[in-house]
C-alpha cells in the first residue's frame, strides 16, 4: 500500500510553496510545524492512530491533488459552447491521455532525476482527473531552469588557480530540469475551458507564453481532428476590465497597483506589509484626489481564504503601455496561494 506521506514528499520535490501546503494542512485540521520534515514528523502519529489514520490519509491525497490543480498558476480562460465542451470531454477521455509516456507511468509522482533527464521536452497529457463540475486533463513536461550559486574563492584546484589567478568569490551557474504540472480544465456548466500553467514563480513571461501556445495548439488540433472544431479556443476572456472592478470593490487588500496619469506619469505602488492596502495609503489617496481618472494597467489583490487559513491572490500583470491602447486586452491571470478548489473558485469569481 502506498504511504500517504508520499504525496507530501511529492509536493516538496516539486518545490510547491510550503506556506500554502501548511495552510492546506491547517484547513484539514492536521498538525503543522516550521518546515517540511518537522511537519511530516507531526503527521506520522496521526497516520498510526486507529481513529484518525483513514481521514488523515484521505486528506493528504486531497491536499496533493488540489495543490497540483490550483496552487500558483498562470491562467487563461476561453468561452466555449457547452455542447462543444461536452463533445470534447468525451473525445479527450478516449484519446487524449498518452498512456505510453514516461510521465504517465508513475503519475502523479514526479520522475526521478535520471528519468527526467531522459524524458522528452514536449508536453503530453498524463492523466484525467474529474471533479464534480469539471474534467481536468493533467499535462506534464520538463523545462530547464538556470540557477546561480556563490562558491568559496578557494574552490579552484591548483592548476585552475595557476591559469586564472586567485578569486575572493566564484559564481557557479547550473541548469537543471524540473517537471511541470499544467492543467487543461473543461467546465461545461460554465461554458469555459481553462488552461492553468505551473512555474509562475520560476519562469519568465516568454517561457510561459511558449508553453501556453503549445498547449493551445495541442487542444485545438485535437478538437479539429476529433470533433471537427478547429478554433475551439478562439474566444479568450479579457481581464483588463476586471482591474477597475477589483480596485473599486471594497473587499480584500490591494497589495500592488500599476497606473498611469494624464500627465504621462507611470506609477507602480506596492505596500511593504501584506496586510496594508494601497488604496488606503495617504500618498496614493492624495494622488487619486488630484487626477481625473486612475488609469490602472495592473493589480494584485488578496483575500482571507474562505477555508480559514491562507490568503489566495489574483494578479493581473501587464506593461504600462497597454493603458494607452484603444482596446486594451489582458488575457492572462496569475492565481496565487490557493490551497484548494474552494480558494481558486472564490478568487476567480472576483474577476469573472
Predicted regions and their residues:
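Intrinsically disordered, low-complexity, charge-rich terminal extensions
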Residues: 1-352
Amino acid at each position: 500500500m502506498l504511504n500517504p506521506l508520499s504525496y507530501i514528499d511529492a509536493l516538496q520535490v516539486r518545490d510547491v510553496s510550503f506556506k500554502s501546503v501548511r495552510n492546506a494542512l491547517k484547513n484539514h485540521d492536521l498538525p503543522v510545524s516550521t518546515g517540511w520534515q518537522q511537519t511530516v514528523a507531526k503527521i506520522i502519529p496521526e497516520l498510526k492512530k486507529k481513529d484518525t489514520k483513514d481521514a488523515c490519509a484521505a486528506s493528504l491525497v486531497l491536499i496533493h491533488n488540489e495543490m497540483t490543480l490550483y496552487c500558483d498558476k498562470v491562467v487563461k480562460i476561453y468561452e466555449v459552447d457547452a455542447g462543444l465542451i461536452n463533445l470534447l470531454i468525451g473525445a479527450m477521455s478516449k484519446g487524449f491521455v498518452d498512456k505510453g509516456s514516461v510521465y504517465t507511468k508513475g503519475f502523479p509522482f514526479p520522475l526521478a532525476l535520471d528519468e527526467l533527464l531522459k524524458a522528452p521536452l514536449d508536453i503530453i497529457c498524463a492523466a484525467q482527473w474529474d471533479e464534480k463540475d469539471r474534467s481536468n486533463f493533467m499535462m506534464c513536461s520538463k523545462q530547464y531552469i538556470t540557477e546561480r550559486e556563490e562558491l568559496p574563492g578557494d574552490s579552484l584546484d591548483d592548476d585552475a588557480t595557476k591559469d586564472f589567478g586567485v578569486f575572493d568569490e566564484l559564481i557557479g551557474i547550473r541548469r537543471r530540469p524540473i517537471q511541470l504540472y499544467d492543467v487543461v480544465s473543461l467546465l461545461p456548466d460554465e461554458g469555459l475551458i481553462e488552461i492553468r500553467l505551473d512555474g509562475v514563480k520560476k519562469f519568465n513571461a516568454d517561457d510561459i507564453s511558449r508553453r501556453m501556445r503549445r498547449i493551445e495548439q495541442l487542444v485545438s488540433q485535437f478538437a479539429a481532428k476529433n470533433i471537427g472544431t478547429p478554433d475551439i479556443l478562439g474566444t479568450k476572456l479579457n481581464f483588463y476590465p476586471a482591474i477597475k472592478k477589483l480596485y473599486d470593490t471594497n473587499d480584500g487588500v490591494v497589495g500592488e497597483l500599476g497606473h498611469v496619469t494624464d500627465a504621462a506619469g507611470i506609477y507602480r505602488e506596492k505596500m511593504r506589509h501584506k496586510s496594508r492596502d494601497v488604496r488606503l495609503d495617504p500618498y496614493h489617496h492624495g494622488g487619486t484626489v488630484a487626477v481625473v481618472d486612475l488609469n490602472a494597467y495592473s493589480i494584485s489583490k488578496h483575500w482571507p481564504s474562505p477555508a480559514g487559513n491562507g490568503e489566495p491572490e489574483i494578479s493581473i500583470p501587464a506593461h504600462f503601455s497597454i493603458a494607452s491602447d484603444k482596446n486594451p486586452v489582458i488575457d492572462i491571470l496569475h492565481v496565487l496561494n490557493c490551497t484548494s478548489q474552494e480558494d481558486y473558485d472564490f478568487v476567480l469569481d472576483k474577476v469573472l
